[in-house]
């Protein structure tokens, strides 16, 4: 009887030892045996959001232009957001790699997984996705309290800005991202969402 009681207690105690688990932007479940201690962030926005999640001190690798906050500039770089070195990533022995789906290309995902690396795909499409990512990063790195606080602050700031703009007539906006050839973004891009938040209207929002 005592043995059975011990077994039952151990069974119900097991979930408390389970590592963090979240669903990433690609709909994949990412589970870790324990909170990540060595993280590689493969895009500047990923690095910034990891710092917002309280996981900046766990970053061991970033990419070029990861310059916010200033502490990010002291972290070793493995390349750029569009061209990074797989060998450099592996050499850092990360227990979590945060991949930018469209920037790095999803083609890199199977290769990283074949090497036994845990990968979270980050692809924020809207402003709400930013705070969701921060919370995910906090869960994965064991800094959920910090992440939730900063994500909630971000959401509150967005709501305040939206209320300030109110029902004012929108201003027509053209956002140039490159000059040769001339390039802009459509309404699905995060930039367009920010334009709308600030009271603008992307004149190319309806383009494919």
PLM regions and their residue ranges:
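A short, structured surface patch at a secondary-structure boundary
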Residues: 37-103, 203
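Short hydrophobic/charged patches on amphipathic alpha-helices used for structural packing
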Residues: 86-87, 109, 192
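Short, structured coil segments at secondary-structure junctions
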Residues: 55, 74, 115-116, 198
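N-terminal signal peptide c-region/cleavage motif recognized by signal peptidases
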Residues: 13-15
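Short, solvent-exposed loop/turn elements at domain surfaces
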Residues: 30-32, 47-52, 67-71, 181-186, ...
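Sec-dependent signal peptide recognition
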Residues: 1-8
């Amino acid at each position: 009887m005592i043995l059975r009681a011990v077994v039952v207690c151990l069974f119900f105690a097991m979930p408390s030892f389970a590592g963090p688990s979240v669903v990433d932007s690609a709909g994949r479940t990412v589970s870790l045996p324990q909170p990540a201690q060595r993280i590689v962030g493969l895009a500047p926005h990923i690095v910034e959001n990891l710092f917002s999640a309280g996981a900046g001190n766990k970053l061991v690798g970033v990419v070029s232009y990861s310059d916010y906050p200033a502490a990010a500039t002291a972290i070793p770089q493995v390349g750029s957001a569009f061209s990074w070195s797989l060998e450099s990533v592996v050499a850092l022995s990360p227990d979590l790699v945060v991949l930018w789906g469209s920037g790095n290309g999803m083609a890199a995902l199977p290769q990283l997984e074949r090497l036994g690396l845990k990968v979270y795909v980050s692809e924020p499409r809207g402003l709400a996705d930013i705070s969701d990512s921060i919370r995910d990063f906090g869960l994965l790195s064991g800094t959920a309290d910090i992440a939730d606080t900063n994500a909630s602050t971000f959401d509150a700031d967005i709501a305040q800005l939206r209320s300030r703009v109110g029902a004012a007539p929108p201003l027509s906006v053209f956002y140039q991202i490159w000059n040769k050839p001339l390039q802009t973004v459509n309404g699905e891009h995060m930039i367009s969402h920010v334009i709308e938040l600030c009271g603008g209207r992307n004149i190319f929002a309806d383009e494919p």
